[in-house]
C-alpha cells in the first residue's frame, strides 16, 4: 500500500511540517507517521524508500488522471445529435459567437466559455439548437463537448488531491478517485454541452485550493501560500460566475476562513499587526479578487452581446436602448412627458410587456362587458396611449396651447389611441385574480366618467417632479377605488388572446408588477434628445441583470413531459433523467448515478455521523486513546468534517427552494459525499486492522478492504456503463435487453 498512511497521526501531526506544502507535505507526514508507527509496532510493514514513495505518488496521480480523461472522452461524439439541455447551452454559445443578446437565469461565465470553445474549434454559430434529437450534421460541435469533457475530467484528480491532503492517505485518495471515475452520472454530465461540468470544475478547484492553502499555514505569506489563497478566490469567482449554486462553496470557504482567523486571533504569539495582515490578505484574495473577476465577466458579457435578440423583452427600456438593432437604439424622442404625448407604457416585471387594449370585450359573466385591457409582450399599435388631463377634452397638441409637462402627483386620463376609450377601473372583480379589480377600456371618443381618473406617481420622488422617458419608474393610482394598476402575470384564456391579465390591486405595496416606465414617446411640440444620454451606467445594468436572473430563477416552471424531482430523491438515486431517446429503436442515454457508488456514499454518511459522534463524545470526555487511534480519529473528524460540511451546504439548501428542481442539481453534493466515503472507509479499515493486530492476517485487512471496494466499484461501472455511453435495443424490462436485471428500482426508466 502507499506510504502516506494516515495512521498514527497525533493532533499536532495534522499540520504539515514547516517549509512543505501540498504533495510534499502529504508525503512527509506519511513518512514521519510510518516511522513512528514502525517504532511502536514491529508488525507494521515498512513502506519503502523515499524515491519509491515519490514515484508511487506521481504514478497514482497520473493513473487516476489518465483513467478520468479516458472515460470522459470515450465515444464523446455519440450521439451526433442534441441531447437534453444542449439545446439551451449550445444555442447560448451560438448567441455569443453571433453577439446576439439573450436572457438566462444563470450568470454568463459558463456560456461564454462554451461559446469561446466553439469559436476556437471552428464552430460558426449557425446551428439552430432547436430541440433534442436534431442532428448536428456538418456543424462542428465536438469542440464544445470536448471543452466540457476536459473540465469534467479534472474532477477526479482534484478530488484525489483534496482527500490526500485531508487524510494523508493514498488509499483514501485512490478510493475517492475510483468512486468518481466509475460513476455513470458524473461521466454523463461531463460529456455534453452543459454548465454542470464547468460548475463542478470550479467548485472542486476552490475546495482543493482551500485545503492546499490550509496545509501551508505554517508558512504564511510565502509564495505557495499566496498562490493557493489567490487560486481559491479565482475559483470562487468561477463557480459563482457559472451558476448561483457557487454561493454554497463560497459559504464553505467563508466558514473555513472565519475559523482560521479566529484561531489566529487566539494565538498570543502573533501580534495584532500580524493578525491584521492575515485578515487583509483574506479580504483581498477571497472577497475583492472574486468580486472583481465576477464583475469582469459581466462586463465582457455586455460588451460581446451588443446586438438585439430574444432577451430584450426581459429587460427595461433603458437597458434595451444599448442594443444595436433594437428600435430604441440610437433613437431620438422627447425626454420629459407632456400632456398630449402618445406613449407606450411597459411593466417593469420580467416578461410582462406593454399596457395594451383592443376592440374585443370581456365575455359575459367576466366583470363588466367592456373593452379588454391586457399586457402584451410584443410591439403593436394597440400599445399606444394618449396622456390627457382628467378634467378637459381640449387637444393639448393644439399650437395655441402652451406645452404643459406631466408631473409627479398629477391627475391624468389615459386614452387608447386606436379605440379612443379611456383606461378605466371599478369595483368589479378581475377576471382571474381574486380581490383585485377589473381594468377595462371605457367611454366614447375620450368621454367617460370619474372611474377613468388616475394619479401618476414617480417612485421615490417628490411631488412636482417631471417624468422622464425610460428612466422614471411610475405607478398609476386609481382615484375612485384607491387601487394600483398592475399586471398579475397570469395568462388569459382564449377570449383574451392568451395575453396577460391587467388588474387594479387594492394592495398598495410597491412591487414590480405595479411599476411601469414610459418607453415610446411622440410629441411634435417637444424637442427630441438622443436616448444615448439616458442609457444606464454599468452598475445599473449589472444590478438590473441580477434582479432579472433572480426573478427568472424563482419563476422557473417544469416543461411538458419533463422529469422533475424532489431533494430527498437524490441521495438514494431514486430517478434519473433521459438525455437522449425513449423507444427501443432510439439511441438512449440516461443520467443515473452508479447505484453501487451512490448507495455506498449514503451508507458512508450514516456511518460517519455514528462513528464521528462516538469519537467526538469519547474525546470530549477525556478518554485516553492509543496514539494511532487518536491520529485516525483526528483525520476522521477534521478531514471528514470538512467534506461533510461541503455535502451539507450543497444539498440541504435545495429543500428551501421554491423553484423547480432536477436530479442533476445534486451532483456537486455528490462529489463531497464521495470524498467522505474515501476518508471514512480508509479510516475504518485501518482501525479494524489496528484492533485485530494480534490476528495473523490483520495486516491484510486494510489492503483487502480497499481492493474489494475498488474492484466492486469498477465491476458496477462495467454493468451500468451503457447508461452513460448509450444503448440501442430492448428496454431494461425486456429479458433480451443488455440491461435486463439491472433495473433495481421501478422508478428507473431505461
From Swiss-Prot:
UniProt keyword list: Congenital muscular dystrophy, Dystroglycanopathy, Endoplasmic reticulum, Glycoprotein, Glycosyltransferase, Limb-girdle muscular dystrophy, Lissencephaly, Membrane, Metal-binding, Phosphoprotein, Repeat, Transferase, Transmembrane, Transmembrane helix
Glycosylation site list: 98, 330, 445, 528, 583
PTM characteristics: N-glycosylated.
EC number: 2.4.1.109
Main location per the UniProt record: endoplasmic reticulum
Residue stretches making up the MIR domain: 334-390, 403-459, 464-521
GO biological process: basement membrane organization; dentate gyrus development; protein O-linked mannosylation; reactive gliosis
Cellular localisation: Endoplasmic reticulum membrane
PROSITE patterns, sorted: MIR
A cellular component annotation (GO) from this entry: nucleolus
Catalytic reaction equation(s): a di-trans,poly-cis-dolichyl beta-D-mannosyl phosphate + L-seryl-[protein] = 3-O-(alpha-D-mannosyl)-L-seryl-[protein] + a di-trans,poly-cis-dolichyl phosphate + H(+); a di-trans,poly-cis-dolichyl beta-D-mannosyl phosphate + L-threonyl-[protein] = 3-O-(alpha-D-mannosyl)-L-threonyl-[protein] + a di-trans,poly-cis-dolichyl phosphate + H(+)
Phosphoserine modified-residue sites: 41
Description of how activity is regulated: Slightly activated by Mg(2+) and inhibited by both Ca(+) and Mn(2+). EDTA ha no effect on activity in vitro.
Tissue expression as described in the entry: Highly expressed in testis; detected at low levels in most tissues.
Membrane topology: Multi-pass membrane protein
Pfam families: MIR, PMT, PMT_4TMC
Pathway: Protein modification; protein glycosylation
Similarity comment: Belongs to the glycosyltransferase 39 family.
Disease: Muscular dystrophy-dystroglycanopathy congenital with brain and eye anomalies A2: An autosomal recessive disorder characterized by congenital muscular dystrophy associated with cobblestone lissencephaly and other brain anomalies, eye malformations, profound intellectual disability, and death usually in the first years of life. Included diseases are the more severe Walker-Warburg syndrome and the slightly less severe muscle-eye-brain disease.
Name of the protein: Protein O-mannosyl-transferase 2
Provenance organism: Homo sapiens
Gene of this entry: POMT2
Amino acid at each position: 500500500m502507499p506510504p502516506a498512511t494516515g495512521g498514527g497521526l497525533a493532533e499536532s501531526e495534522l499540520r504539515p511540517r514547516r517549509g512543505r506544502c501540498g504533495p510534499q507535505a502529504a508525503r512527509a507526514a506519511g513518512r514521519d507517521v510510518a516511522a513512528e508507527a514502525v517504532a511502536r509496532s514491529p508488525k507494521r510493514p515498512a513502506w519503502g524508500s523515499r524515491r519509491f514513495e515519490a514515484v508511487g505518488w506521481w504514478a497514482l496521480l497520473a493513473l487516476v488522471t489518465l483513467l478520468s480523461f479516458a472515460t470522459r472522452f470515450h465515444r464523446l461524439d455519440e450521439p451526433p445529435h442534441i441531447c437534453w439541455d444542449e439545446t439551451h447551452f449550445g444555442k447560448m454559445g451560438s448567441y455569443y459567437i453571433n453577439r446576439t443578446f439573450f436572457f438566462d437565469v444563470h450568470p454568463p461565465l459558463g456560456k461564454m466559455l462554451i461559446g469561446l470553445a466553439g469559436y476556437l474549434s471552428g464552430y460558426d454559430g449557425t446551428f439552430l439548437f432547436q430541440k433534442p434529437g436534431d442532428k448536428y450534421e456538418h456543424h462542428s460541435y465536438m469542440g464544445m463537448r470536448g471543452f466540457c469533457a476536459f473540465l469534467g475530467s479534472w474532477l477526479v484528480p482534484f478530488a484525489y488531491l483534496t482527500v490526500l491532503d485531508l487524510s494523508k492517505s493514498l488509499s483514501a485518495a485512490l478510493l475517492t478517485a475510483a468512486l468518481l471515475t466509475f460513476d455513470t452520472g458524473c461521466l454523463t454530465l461531463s460529456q455534453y454541452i452543459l454548465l454542470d461540468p464547468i460548475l463542478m470544475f470550479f467548485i472542486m478547484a476552490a475546495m482543493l485550493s482551500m485545503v492546499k492553502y490550509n496545509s501551508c499555514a505554517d508558512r504564511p505569506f510565502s509564495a505557495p501560500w499566496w498562490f493557493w489563497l489567490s487560486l481559491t478566490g479565482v475559483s470562487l469567482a468561477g463557480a459563482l460566475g457559472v451558476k448561483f449554486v457557487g454561493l454554497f462553496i463560497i459559504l464553505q470557504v467563508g466558514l473555513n476562513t472565519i475559523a482560521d482567523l479566529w484561531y489566529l486571533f487566539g494565538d498570543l504569539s502573533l501580534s495584532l499587526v500580524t493578525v491584521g495582515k492575515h485578515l487583509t490578505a483574506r479580504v483581498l484574495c477571497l472577497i475583492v479578487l472574486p468580486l472583481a473577476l465576477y464583475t469582469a465577466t459581466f462586463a465582457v458579457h455586455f460588451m460581446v452581446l451588443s446586438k438585439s435578440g430574444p432577451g430584450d423583452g426581459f429587460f427595461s427600456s433603458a437597458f434595451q436602448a444599448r442594443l444595436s438593432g433594437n428600435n430604441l437604439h440610437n433613437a431620438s424622442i422627447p425626454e420629459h412627458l407632456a400632456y398630449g404625448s402618445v406613449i407606450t407604457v411597459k411593466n417593469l416585471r420580467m416578461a410582462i410587456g406593454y399596457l395594451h387594449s383592443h376592440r374585443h370585450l370581456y365575455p359575459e359573466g367576466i366583470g363588466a362587458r367592456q373593452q379588454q385591457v391586457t399586457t402584451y409582450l410584443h410591439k403593436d399599435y394597440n400599445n399606444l396611449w394618449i396622456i390627457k388631463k382628467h378634467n378637459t377634452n381640449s387637444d393639448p397638441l393644439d399650437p395655441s396651447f402652451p406645452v404643459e409637462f406631466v408631473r409627479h402627483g398629477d391627475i391624468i386620463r389615459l386614452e387608447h389611441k386606436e379605440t379612443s376609450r379611456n383606461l378605466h377601473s371599478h369595483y368589479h372583480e378581475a377576471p382571474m385574480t381574486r380581490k383585485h379589480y377589473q381594468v377595462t377600456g371605457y367611454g366614447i371618443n375620450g368621454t367617460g366618467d370619474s372611474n377613468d381618473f388616475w394619479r401618476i406617481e414617480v417612485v421615490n420622488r417628490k411631488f412636482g417632479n417631471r417624468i422622464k422617458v425610460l428612466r422614471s419608474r411610475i405607478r398609476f393610482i386609481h382615484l375612485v377605488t384607491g387601487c394600483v394598476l398592475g399586471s398579475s402575470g397570469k395568462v388569459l384564456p382564449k377570449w383574451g388572446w392568451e395575453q396577460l391579465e391587467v388588474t387594479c390591486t387594492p394592495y398598495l405595496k410597491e412591487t414590480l408588477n405595479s411599476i411601469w416606465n414610459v418607453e415610446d414617446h411622440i410629441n411634435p411640440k417637444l424637442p427630441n434628445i438622443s436616448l444615448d444620454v439616458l442609457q444606464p451606467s454599468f452598475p445599473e445594468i449589472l444590478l438590473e441583470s441580477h434582479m432579472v436572473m433572480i426573478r427568472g430563477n424563482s419563476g422557473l416552471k417544469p416543461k411538458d413531459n419533463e422529469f422533475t424531482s424532489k431533494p430527498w430523491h437524490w441521495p438514494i438515486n431514486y430517478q434519473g433523467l433521459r438525455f437522449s431517446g425513449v423507444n427501443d429503436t432510439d439511441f438512449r442515454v440516461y443520467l443515473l448515478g452508479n447505484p453501487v457508488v451512490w448507495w455506498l456514499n449514503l451508507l458512508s454518511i450514516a456511518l460517519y455521523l455514528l462513528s464521528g459522534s462516538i469519537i467526538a463524545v469519547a474525546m470530549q470526555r477525556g478518554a485516553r486513546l492509543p496514539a494511532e487511534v487518536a491520529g485516525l480519529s483526528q483525520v476522521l473528524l477534521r478531514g471528514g468534517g470538512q467534506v461533510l460540511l461541503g455535502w451539507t451546504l450543497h444539498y440541504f439548501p435545495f429543500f428551501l427552494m421554491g423553484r423547480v428542481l432536477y436530479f442533476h442539481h445534486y451532483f456537486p453534493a455528490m462529489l463531497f459525499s464521495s470524498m467522505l466515503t474515501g476518508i471514512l472507509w480508509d479510516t475504518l479499515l485501518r482501525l479494524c486492522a489496528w484492533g485485530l493486530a494480534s490476528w495473523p492476517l490483520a495486516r491484510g485487512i486494510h489492503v483487502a478492504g480497499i481492493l474489494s471496494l475498488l474492484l466492486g466499484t469498477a465491476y458496477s461501472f462495467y454493468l451500468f456503463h451503457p447508461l452513460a455511453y448509450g444503448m440501442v435495443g430492448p428496454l431494461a424490462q425486456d429479458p433480451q435487453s443488455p440491461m435486463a436485471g439491472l433495473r433495481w428500482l421501478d422508478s428507473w426508466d431505461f
